[in-house]
Amino acid sequence: MAFWNEKTLAQMSTQEWESLCDGCGKCCLNKLIDDETEQLYYTNAACLLLDNKAGHCQNYEQRFSFVPSCTKVTVDNIESLTWLPDSCAYRRLFMGRELPTWHPLRTGSKEAMILAGMSVAGKVTCETKIRDIEDHIVLWPMKDVE
């Protein structure tokens, strides 16, 4: 049986916890909240550390030094990180859901994730090149497939 089915999030080792991240890059997208409706919107404006072609952080180990606003997902804050997409493994497991069939832990590679359209790779622009972020609102990051 897979470790994510045997253990709670709190019981996982650091290595197990880190391996839950599928590397989709959706958490690295700039998000907007409508002041009137409090609706969350994703944009295709990505963190300056995100490799736009590969869809992952270019300096993951030192990301907090370069981007102090970067959020570290932990067992202690997962409940409050409601902005994480429903496809996020941390969020899915916290909500009592299974990892999707395309998840790298289940398939052995990121290829199925990319084919399922779950990665930001090739779909984003660096935030430093964006002028009017409202023009970059997108719906695809909210997509969740089993």
UniProtKB/Swiss-Prot annotation:
It comes from the Bacteria. Transmembrane segments: none annotated. Belongs to the UPF0260 family. This is UPF0260 protein Shal_1839. It comes from Shewanella halifaxensis (strain HAW-EB4).
